[in-house]
């Protein structure tokens, strides 16, 4: 059976079972009922219905995030079409792809073409996005280039998280859940009026325990969480025309690192016997070299783990001038990353890694927006300064006879000027035009890799370089509303991403050469329609022309006699589409489904150099890109009354298609097989509306074995990061 047929059958089956199987028990919608709720978003920096915005987007409420077990940004790939978030070697370095547009790198210094922001503050680098999601009002995932309305420019899209705001009335609540592997999670908030015109909100969350992996040699567990995060907000409204919101957040993560398992047998550098490939995805291995442990400053008996912190402060001010509104967003964020990982997944010191990163980011945005009318406009400027210091330690003793230490600093300054206007040509036709100009200077300082004394030495000294980019982008769109409940839109947009550097552990001169900015021209058409008061269907189709796409290539370095990764630029084409459906056929029944399709091909000369210098290079011109063609998912829920209680049964599921990472990893087969995931929730609440609920939940209830990524650091060790097995638990929630 084809993937297309499977997706259609699953969607039809879910809808049929919910509608037909529950019809006898569920009452029909009364004339006063509204089957569909209006979803209000701020994707265009104004509050408006998502159905009136000509952007393909997915919007998930805070409650939906809980039901779908989305506790951090990576989990969104199980709820959004054409989105993948791959953890580099299972680490806290996420690699985002949206509609096939992404950037694959295990180091910290390069930006992502998929932007992520919290409360209007954009994260500069992907490593900043790995905090807990808690006390969230909603998340908006915008597909396609963004940048003519706010903040940073993106080629792939934008993920915007909006937290719950302070309230005038006193509110408080908590949730407490316990699950398999002794995992204990808790979250709470308190909100209310502090003084006349001054509101406050304090939120806190923690995750503890949950180890699900085992050391194949010692039997030690791995995977315990140890996270805590806090967010405070003050909202001050001194006048009707002036308001301020101050946000402060802090997070600490001392969790175990996810372990990797062996895809293929591993032969130590010191010789046989080999370690067999793991029969269980939940097996792993590690052991610290005492010399390496002393160098990085941790105990020699330590498990792979993190000691990361992510703190920040932001101030948003709004001044209403009557005909226009001025918004200022000032933010400072600091991230400290201390992460020990074993990327060979054995007790040998073949690829043991330690990442020591310090990142400071300051950003300032000024935006002036008109009031509502036939002509609506917004214009602004965005400034960002990033300063990253990173030390990357690699214990290669068993394979290469030493410990490599890579150090560098990267400083980036960027300024973006943007403007967009919408004009209502007729009652049913609206035109949009947006422009943007970005200027960025990115400088790499002191890139150097050295082996400890007495071990083989790499030649060369500290390297450096800089790249300055001036990048125009823009958007043109037409919206047509033949009916009040239907929007048709067509757009042409251009997104850009700045160039950068390959900051891997090499001191060969080409490593300091910058790669060029990438440019993407997107053509898109779409429809958003409330077909009936109980059925909503949104669909989009797109075609991308990608110039100078940034790709991690592979070359053979004659100095170190091993493969090294180096970013190169190539052209490609990507096309695809999405369909989102929401249906409330009967009172108490809610069904949502999505399907996404994406395929891409390289369209320029792109050479991969084999390890064996006697073999000719491989040209990937015309070959497919590395991302899944099909994504599918949805959820079905049914709520009914049983005596004095309300019961809700909910199930959500997702499908991820097969894809190969052949270009990044050469001729070896690192294909990630397709997989299905399913979760379920059963919630009991008082029918009277009392403020407590009890939920029994299950994640990966079909106990599917699947991989999040497959890779190698040195060719001797082919590894994968597995997804979590089945877990079950109970959650108690109380809010007033």
Pin down the residues of each PLM region:
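Acidic, small-polar-rich N-terminal luminal/periplasmic segments of exported/outer-membrane proteins
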Residues: 16, 34-169, 525
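Structural signature of Gram-negative outer-membrane beta-barrels, strongest in the C-terminal barrel
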Residues: 235-239, 368-369, 382-384, 411-545
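Gram-negative outer-membrane beta-barrel transporters
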Residues: 424-427, 431, 541-545, 566-662, ...
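Membrane-embedded beta-barrel scaffold of Gram-negative outer-membrane proteins
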Residues: 314-320, 325-341, 481, 487-497, ...
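Periplasmic-side early beta-strands and strand-to-turn transitions of outer-membrane beta-barrels
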Residues: 160, 167-169, 177, 189-287, ...
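Outer-membrane beta-barrel translocator/receptor signature
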Residues: 94, 111-113, 125, 134-143, ...
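Repeated loop/turn-to-beta-strand initiation elements of outer-membrane beta-barrel proteins
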Residues: 170, 197-200, 241-244, 323-326, ...
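Conserved C-terminal beta-signal and adjacent last beta-strands/turns
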Residues: 191, 361-380, 421-424, 523, ...
